[in-house]
Amino acid sequence: MKETKQEEMEVREDCESVDSNLEATVEEMESTKGTSEDLEQKLAEKTAQYEDIFSQFQRLQADFTNYKKRVEKEKGDIYLYANEKIALDLLNIIDNFERAIQSTEKTEENDSLLQGISLVYKQLLDTLTKHGVEEIEAMEKPFDMNLHYAVMQEESEGASNYVIDVLQKGYKIKDRILRPAMVKVSK
């Protein structure tokens, strides 16, 4: 009997040990369960934060790419239209050359002077053409408010809204208008 009591005691101790281990395991599982839920919540928060930062990064990258393209275009435009201001100033000189040629053509005196003025005028026009300045064709063309500046209207036998006289030539550099042509338009 002693042995059975001793065995019984050992069994009880083992049971108590198992019970305490079981309780500790249950407590650990419950605490881990709470921690697991916390970890899942933190993971979801970090994932949302990452997606937000990644989205901001993509927008910033697109903005930078657009900025680089815009700067390259502006640099190209600077080179294309660098002569625009000086060409605009030279247009008044061209107008004066044209007036001088017209006034000397009426008088037959100073034929050599007329030739000299004509040569300088042609050279100036050639230089401007070489740098992209072109005359706007206006005579007998349909009136275009982007290219022409109508200062007069006159009854005409032809179609209406056509340029019938050019009072001052217009010029453009590449695709930009330096000065619109001042014209008379048919009614």
Swiss-Prot record:
**PANTHER family linked to this entry:** GRPE PROTEIN (PTHR21237), GRPE PROTEIN HOMOLOG, MITOCHONDRIAL (PTHR21237:SF23)
Top-level taxonomy = Bacteria, Bacillati, Bacillota, Clostridia, Peptostreptococcales
Q: Where is the segment annotated Disordered?
A: 1-40
> What does the UniProt entry say about where the protein is found?
Cytoplasm
- State the species of origin: Alkaliphilus oremlandii (strain OhILAs)
Q: Name one Pfam family in it.
A: GrpE
Q: Does the keyword Chaperone apply?
A: yes
Question: Source organism's superkingdom?
Answer: Bacteria
Q: Where's it mainly located?
A: cytoplasm
Protein name stated in the entry: Protein GrpE
- The protein's assembly and partners: Homodimer.
The family note in this entry says:
Belongs to the GrpE family.
> What's a single GO MF annotation on this record?
protein-folding chaperone binding
